[in-house]
């Protein structure tokens, strides 16, 4: 009988990546097949996030639901991973004694051994250590699920912003070697992946070891990824302004595979608040980066993160944030009201901004960025955009859907063989959350580089001489 695994994931793209690796790992070692139905599962895993408000209570609320399933099936294994697990550790079992496994983001590769241990003597396992980059050496080969893929290139963060738990839950920065990253991406390209999104809590701080023992920069890595046949789009997230060096900007000038869209968090437009946040850059320095980026890539669009109502934020501080939003003309944002994360320096600051004032500021900020986003979308009307076709449209099974470089969803009429390929689409309609268009060019007319397996290259290029001896003809 097939054993089943259910994973519930909260939080960032790194958590999504980690969850996919958990599924691949447990399929390879134990034959577990994923199920969307928790009631069917033999193992339940909760991959948690501690960024949002009341993250801990959200975890225990979910565990309370799963407790009922365990009462019906005592052999059910329940595991909690991610950043809340890293923060809370064994405290989770003190409140939820029925949890069998507690693991951190850096120990997910040990899940097979943890499950074996629980199956063997029914004793709980807690492992929230930080064994640096070990987890990547223990994971199975990547499996593509569609034309886009996430690839983690580093873990952790050294910046210690006063509001952020990441350095405490994921550890300090550790970069994967460049060869490991490139090999993973080449494997994905051979399976049909056309777009990769390089992941890291502070991704542009990557400093990985090269094959010859030297240390590569993030700019070096971007160019190497762009050279892989079949990879025609590169994204990365999340960046820090202090690490956004001029050599990265030069990659935007000479590497078309790097998309004309960048998510670069700023958090506030007021230098006083940035200082309280421990951001180590000013609003002027941030704008200087954007100015240089737009000199290298004039059509680039920028998204960002904002925290409103940070302790000590005045009306004047908020007005400076709104001025920065107008000056940069952000395309979109992830914006939130400040809520203290336990164990961070900001949790000890006096939260002196009234809740209603926080809500009003958030509303004003989001309305402004929504207006700017719509203005950007309207500029696309009548233009031809290159779309990576991801699958059937959510709006209609008779249509296809894909994304532009600037992350807009586009719905259009097409044929099934277009899925996983690029098409050029003329934008005919603009809506709040999507665009509509018509296909004007297919991939066959674009001259793109397509990844091939070694076997297909040999089959295509192998020739035989007059006596039947094979030889290679490139």
Swiss-Prot record:
Q: Extract the SUPFAM superfamilies matched here.
A: Radical SAM enzymes
Top EC group: transferase
What molecular function terms (GO) are annotated for this protein? 4 iron, 4 sulfur cluster binding; metal ion binding; N6-isopentenyladenosine methylthiotransferase activity
Residue span, TRAM domain: 378-441
Q: Which cofactors, by name?
A: [4Fe-4S] cluster
Q: Does the keyword Transcription apply?
A: no
Where, subcellularly, is it found?
Cytoplasm
- Key words, A-Z: 4Fe-4S, Cytoplasm, Iron, Iron-sulfur, Metal-binding, S-adenosyl-L-methionine, Transferase, tRNA processing
Q: Which SMART domains match?
A: Elp3 (SM00729)
Q: Locate the MTTase N-terminal domain: which residues?
A: 3-120
Q: Which residues bind [4Fe-4S] cluster 2?
A: 157, 161, 164
* Coiled coil (residue ranges): none
Question: What do the Gene Ontology cellular component annotations say?
Answer: cytosol
Query: Which InterPro entries does this entry report, sorted A to Z?
Result: Elp3/MiaA/NifB-like_rSAM (IPR006638), Methylthiotransferase (IPR005839), Methylthiotransferase_CS (IPR020612), Methylthiotransferase_N (IPR013848), Methylthiotransferase_N_sf (IPR038135), MiaB_methiolase (IPR006463), rSAM (IPR007197), rSAM_horseshoe (IPR023404)
TM segment ranges: none
Cofactor stoichiometry and binding remark: Binds 2 [4Fe-4S] clusters. One cluster is coordinated with 3 cysteines and an exchangeable S-adenosyl-L-methionine.
Family as reported in the entry's similarity comment? Belongs to the methylthiotransferase family. MiaB subfamily.
Identify the NCBIfam families for this entry: miaB-methiolase, MiaB/RimO family radical SAM methylthiotransferase
Entry protein name: tRNA-2-methylthio-N(6)-dimethylallyladenosine synthase
Q: Which organism is it from?
A: Citrobacter koseri (strain ATCC BAA-895 / CDC 4225-83 / SGSC4696)
Name the gene that codes for it.
Answer: miaB
């Amino acid at each position: 009988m097939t054993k089943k695994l259910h994973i519930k994931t909260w939080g960032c793209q790194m958590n999504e990546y980690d969850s996919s690796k958990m599924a691949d790992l447990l399929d390879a070692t134990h034959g577990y097949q994923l199920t969307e139905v928790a009631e069917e599962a033999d193992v339940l895993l909760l991959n948690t996030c501690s960024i949002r408000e009341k993250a801990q209570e959200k975890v225990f609320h979910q565990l309370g639901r799963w407790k009922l399933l365990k009462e019906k099936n005592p052999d059910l294994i329940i595991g909690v991973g991610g950043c809340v697990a890293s923060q809370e550790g064994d405290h989770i079992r003190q409140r939820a004694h029925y949890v069998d496994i507690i693991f951190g983001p850096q120990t997910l590769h040990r899940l097979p051994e943890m499950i074996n241990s629980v199956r063997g003597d029914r004793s709980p396992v807690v492992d929230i250590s930080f064994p640096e980059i070990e987890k990547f050496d223990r994971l199975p080969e990547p499996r593509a699920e569609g034309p886009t893929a996430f690839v983690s290139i580093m873990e952790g963060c050294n910046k210690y912003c006063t509001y952020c738990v990441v350095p405490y839950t994921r550890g300090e920065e550790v970069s994967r070697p460049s060869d490991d990253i490139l090999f993973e991406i080449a494997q994905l390209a051979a399976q049909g992946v056309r777009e990769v999104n390089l992941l890291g809590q502070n991704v542009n701080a990557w400093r990985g070891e090269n094959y010859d023992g030297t240390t590569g920069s993030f700019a070096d890595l971007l160019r190497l990824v762009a050279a892989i046949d079949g990879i025609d789009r590169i994204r990365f997230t999340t960046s820090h302004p202090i690490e956004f060096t001029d050599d990265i900007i030069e990659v935007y000038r000479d590497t078309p595979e790097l998309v004309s869209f960048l998510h670069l968090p700023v958090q506030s437009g007021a230098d006083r608040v940035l200082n309280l946040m421990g951001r180590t850059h000013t609003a002027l320095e941030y704008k200087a980066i954007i100015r240089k980026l737009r000199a290298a890539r004039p059509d680039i669009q920028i998204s960002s993160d904002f925290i409103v109502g940070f302790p000590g934020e005045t009306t004047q501080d908020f007005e400076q944030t709104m001025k920065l939003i107008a000056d940069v003309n952000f395309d979109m944002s992830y914006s939130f009201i400040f809520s203290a994360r336990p164990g961070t320096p900001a949790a000890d600051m006096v939260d002196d901004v009234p809740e209603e004032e926080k809500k009003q500021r958030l509303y004003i900020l989001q309305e402004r960025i929504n207006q700017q986003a719509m203005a950007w979308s309207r500029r696309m009307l009548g233009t031809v955009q290159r779309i990576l076709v991801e699958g059937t449209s959510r709006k209609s099974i008779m249509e296809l859907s894909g994304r532009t470089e600037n992350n807009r969803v586009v719905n259009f009429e097409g044929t099934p063989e277009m899925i996983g390929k690029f098409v050029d689409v003329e934008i005919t309609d603009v809506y709040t959350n999507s665009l509509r268009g018509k296909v004007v060019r297919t991939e066959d007319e674009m001259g793109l580089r397509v990844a091939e397996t070694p076997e297909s290259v040999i089959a295509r290029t192998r020739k035989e001489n007059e006596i039947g001896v094979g030889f290679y003809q490139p």
